């Protein structure tokens, strides 16, 4: 073997060999238990960053481990390839989105392959390929046929200069367009939705079926779904036949209503506004509706409102209360109206004070019966109902039920469960997305494109100006088609789908990625699903994971898959952070190349810099390019550092010194095998007659097997597993019994245990030992419990609780024998001398403590 570890040569060699061997191909043999390991697939930006590397290396270790443990493993990869960046590239660089995307995919695929990932590339999916989005469209039609896809008017971000719709991420923090700089307006457009609210209860309850998910992620999803149990109440409008419907979780406070608030967009707003208030109300509406939803609902956003002049009637006591509109009430949430109970709601209390609205107490603590108390803050706890008519004196918990019962009997309310979750708006007025496969006919209405006409392909002869309507909406040759139902002239839908649609089912496609006849066959999808281990960033904890769960339940109900949940276990890896230098006075970030780390100062001003770790990003100049790390150290070192530096769920702080440390460790493994090769000679010695050195080494080998297996089979503590590899390497260095079968066992075990972490060097050294079969095809080492047993143990000798020394004793010694060995030892005799031993405390396997008297 070569005397020097050459990572670059070894890694190129084995990556090519593995491809030729088909080592990473998914086996068809279903006699073995299946294991589906999956990383969240990337957007093809063109370059891997360290966050990608961490994600994919974690999954790769799991996939390699499971193969060695006897599973047939599915470990695929693909590309979440539709989206705005490609369309922006078309506008800015004059390159077609498809060309830009596929160039990036080729570049990133090569980078992934250089990491030595054991991916089955024959199952690669690309969401912008017609071969994939044909089935995205087919699945959309499954939703449509089930009544789960529909159109309605909805507010969008509108750029008045470019005359186009903007995604939320294209609107800056000041509510301006990313491109034109114009103040973004809110505009109503007819949009497509998926009825995820029909599955709200299932999505909430089935979180209990996911013990392998982090609790924080399940809590985030539960909060997003936002189940509320309360009442639906109707407030008549003075002088009108119509009523304002509100939802409340505190019906017990209804006698404390002193105003009602409508969303500015509510259809009743213009009707309840008096002529006197019309001008002011319209001005207020224009100001409010120009703001994005994010701006209006921000925690620190002042809650503003204005009187409409209209009044509503509290149906419980007949009192008239003013109707206002306010910026914090959104028409898309709940009923688009709320009842104001300032005495018992923190937000309402502040709003009432600012708008000089009355505050009426209707709940008081049990130990306080004063009904005329003046509040300095809202009382939001349970208590006793007061100022509440016939409900006075009732505890508020009981009062909730009583109020609802009364409202139901009187016909102006009922019990209701409401969810914060809203239906999923999937329309995008963009080009680079999956076309929505419907046709609008003047006679037949909305008609689905027939299955045999799928996919509806994106036209290529389009112009990308970034202004006006979507490029699709301007292309008459593509829009105008005959109606599939009646044959008369009709028009295609010009909206494309939210890219979250593409990523909501890709894990199903991987199970049957090359099927041209269907999205996935029932046999194959049921064979592989659910995903056993899903790995990705916590930033996807809500939307992507929730939408994927929703999709899975819908296709289950359509008879396309048998599972309830897509992902059995979820690992959300922490961020990769880089050393960051920032001038605290100017807020300017300084590239590390311009800073002396021993004395960090601004190179321009000489001012001291703040130094801290922060998520890697270009704008902060704190990123580390994976290509540079691979070029200097190789993929195996990069993998080892990523796995060793921090537990997978924690943030990882990049440290060049620790990278160097892992490189030194792999060089050490290289030397261990080299020295073994140089000094080992065949021996007929049996394991039965082992020396103490051999016994100690064999114990170290099986401790490593035990600890590493537990680390990987449990909570994926890769960092402690790498530590165990280091301990085993130290044991081999110390033992030096090269001709012993135990040493051979140790070297081979080290390489097999190392293989999932550093696959290239493990493979090279395995073959150096004379093996012809891949190290990755070896069975995972099995623990021999007898190897952990020891002949002798170290016994601590204490006098009056103070340690005076240690002795070696047989591990099988009884309590009485331990006392005898301890008393007769030189250590005890020297310290006890002529002292009288009053008591002896024996802790078997650990210590003997002598209590003496004067």
Curated annotation (Swiss-Prot):
Q: Which UniProt keywords apply?
A: Aminoacyl-tRNA synthetase, ATP-binding, Cytoplasm, Ligase, Nucleotide-binding, Protein biosynthesis
Q: Which domain of life is it from?
A: Bacteria
Task: Report the locations given in the UniProt record.
Answer: Cytoplasm
Q: Which portions of the sequence form the region Disordered?
A: 586-607
Q: What is its EC number?
A: 6.1.1.4
User: One MF term from GO for this chain?
Assistant: ATP binding
Q: Does the keyword Protein biosynthesis apply?
A: yes
GO terms for cellular component: cytosol
What's one Pfam family the UniProt record gives for this protein?
A: Anticodon_1
GO annotation (BP), single: leucyl-tRNA aminoacylation
Q: Which residues bind ATP?
A: 618
Q: Where is this motif: 'KMSKS' region?
A: 615-619
User: What is this enzyme's class at the first EC digit?
Assistant: ligase
The sequence motif named 'HIGH' region is recorded at 42-52
Catalytic reaction annotation: tRNA(Leu) + L-leucine + ATP = L-leucyl-tRNA(Leu) + AMP + diphosphate
InterPro entries reported for this sequence = aa-tRNA-synth_I_CS, aa-tRNA-synth_Ia, Leu-tRNA-ligase, Leu_tRNA-synth_edit, M/V/L/I-tRNA-synth_anticd-bd, Methionyl/Leucyl_tRNA_Synth, Rossmann-like_a/b/a_fold, tRNAsynth_Ia_anticodon-bd
- Please report which protein family the annotation says this sequence is part of: Belongs to the class-I aminoacyl-tRNA synthetase family.
List, alphabetically, the NCBIfam families matched.
Answer: leuS_bact
Know the name of this protein?
A: Leucine--tRNA ligase
This chain's source organism reads Gloeothece citriformis (strain PCC 7424) (Cyanothece sp. (strain PCC 7424))
């Amino acid at each position: 073997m070569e005397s020097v570890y050459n990572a670059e040569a070894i890694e190129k060699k084995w990556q090519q060999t593995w491809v030729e061997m088909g080592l990473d191909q998914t086996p068809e043999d279903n006699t073995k238990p299946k294991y589906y390991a999956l990383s969240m697939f990337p957007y093809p930006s063109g370059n891997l960053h360290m966050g990608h590397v961490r994600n994919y290396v974690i999954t790769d270790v799991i996939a390699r481990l499971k193969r060695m443990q006897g599973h047939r493993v599915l470990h695929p990869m693909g590309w979440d390839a539709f989206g705005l960046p490609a369309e922006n590239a078309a506008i800015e660089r004059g390159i077609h989105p498809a060309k830009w995307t596929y160039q990036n995919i080729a570049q990133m695929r090569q980078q992934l392959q250089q990491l030595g990932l054991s991916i089955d590339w024959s199952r690669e999916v690309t969401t912008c390929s017609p071969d994939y989005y044909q089935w995205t469209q087919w699945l959309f039609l499954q939703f449509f046929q089930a009544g789960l896809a529909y159109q309605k008017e909805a507010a969008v971000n509108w750029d008045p200069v470019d005359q186009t719709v903007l995604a939320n991420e294209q609107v800056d923090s000041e509510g301006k367009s990313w491109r034109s700089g114009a103040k973004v307006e809110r505009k109503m457009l007819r949009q497509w939705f998926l009825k995820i609210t029909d599955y709200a209860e299932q999505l909430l309850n089935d979180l209990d079926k996911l013990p392998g998910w982090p609790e924080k992620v399940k809590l985030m999803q539960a909060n997003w779904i936002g189940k509320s149990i309360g009442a639906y109440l109707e407030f008549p409008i003075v002088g009108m036949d119509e009523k304002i419907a509100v939802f409340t979780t505190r019906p017990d406070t209804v006698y404390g209503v002193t105003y009602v608030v409508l969303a500015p967009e509510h259809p009743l707003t213009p009707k309840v506004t008096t002529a006197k208030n019309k001008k002011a109300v319209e001005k207020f509406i224009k100001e409010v509706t120009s703001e994005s939803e994010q701006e209006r609902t921000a925690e620190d956003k002042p809650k503003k409102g204005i009187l409409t002049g209209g009044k509503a009637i509290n149906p419980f006591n007949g009192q008239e209360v003013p109707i206002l509109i306010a910026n914090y009430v959104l028409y898309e949430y709940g009923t688009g109206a709320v009842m104001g109970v300032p005495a018992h709601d923190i937000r309402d209390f502040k709003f009432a004070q600012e708008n000089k609205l009355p505050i009426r107490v209707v709940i008081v603590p049990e130990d306080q019966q004063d009904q005329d108390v003046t509040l300095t803050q809202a009382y939001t706890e349970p208590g006793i109902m007061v100022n509440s008519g016939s409900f006075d004196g009732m505890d508020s918990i009981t009062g909730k039920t009583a109020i609802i019962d009364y409202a139901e009997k009187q016909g102006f309310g009922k019990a209701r469960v409401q969810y914060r979750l809203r239906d999923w708006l999937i329309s995008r007025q963009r080009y680079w997305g999956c076309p929505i496969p419907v046709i609008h006919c003047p006679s037949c209405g909305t008609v689905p494109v027939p299955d045999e006409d799928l996919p509806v392909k994106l036209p290529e002869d389009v112009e990308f100006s970034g202004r006006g309507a979507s490029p699709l909406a301007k292309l008459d040759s593509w829009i105008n088609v005959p109606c599939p139902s009646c044959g008369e002239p009709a028009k295609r839908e010009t909206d494309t789908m939210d890219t979250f649609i593409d990523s909501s089912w890709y894990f199903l496609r991987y199970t049957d990625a090359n099927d041209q006849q269907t999205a996935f066959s029932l046999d194959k999808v049921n064979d592989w699903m659910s995903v056993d281990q899903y790995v990705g960033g916590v930033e996807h904890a809500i939307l992507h994971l929730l939408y994927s769960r929703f999709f899975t339940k819908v296709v289950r109900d359509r008879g396309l898959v048998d599972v309830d949940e897509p992902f059995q276990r979820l690992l959300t890896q922490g961020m990769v952070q880089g050393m960051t230098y920032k001038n605290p006075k100017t807020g300017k970030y300084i590239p590390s190349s311009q800073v002396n780390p021993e004395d960090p100062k601004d190179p321009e001003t000489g001012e001291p810099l703040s130094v801290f770790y922060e998520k890697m990003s270009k704008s902060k100049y704190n990123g580390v390019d994976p290509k540079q790390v691979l070029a200097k150290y190789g993929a195996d070192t990069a993998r080892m550092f990523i796995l060793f530096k921090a537990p997978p769920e924690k943030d990882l702080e990049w440290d060049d010194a620790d990278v160097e440390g892992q490189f030194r460790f792999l060089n050490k493994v290289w030397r261990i095998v080299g020295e073994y090769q140089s000094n080992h000679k065949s021996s007929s010695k049996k394991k039965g007659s082992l020396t103490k050195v051999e016994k100690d080494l064999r114990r170290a080998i099986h401790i490593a097997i035990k600890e590493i297996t537990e680390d990987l089979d449990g909570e994926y503590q890769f960092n402690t597993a790498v530590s165990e590899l280091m301990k085993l390497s130290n044991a081999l260095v110390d033992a030096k019994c090269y001709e012993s079968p135990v040493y051979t066992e140790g070297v081979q075990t080290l390489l097999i245990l190392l293989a999932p972490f550093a696959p290239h060097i493990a493979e090279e050294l395995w073959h150096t030992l004379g093996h012809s079969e891949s190290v990755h095809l070896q069975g995972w080492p099995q623990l021999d419990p007898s190897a952990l047993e020891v002949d002798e143990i170290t016994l601590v000798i204490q006098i009056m609780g103070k340690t005076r020394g240690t002795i070696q004793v047989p591990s099988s010694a009884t309590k009485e024998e331990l006392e005898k060995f301890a008393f007769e030892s030189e250590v005890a005799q020297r310290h006890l001398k002529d002292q009288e031993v009053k008591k002896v405390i024996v802790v078997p396997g650990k210590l003997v403590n002598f209590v003496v008297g004067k």
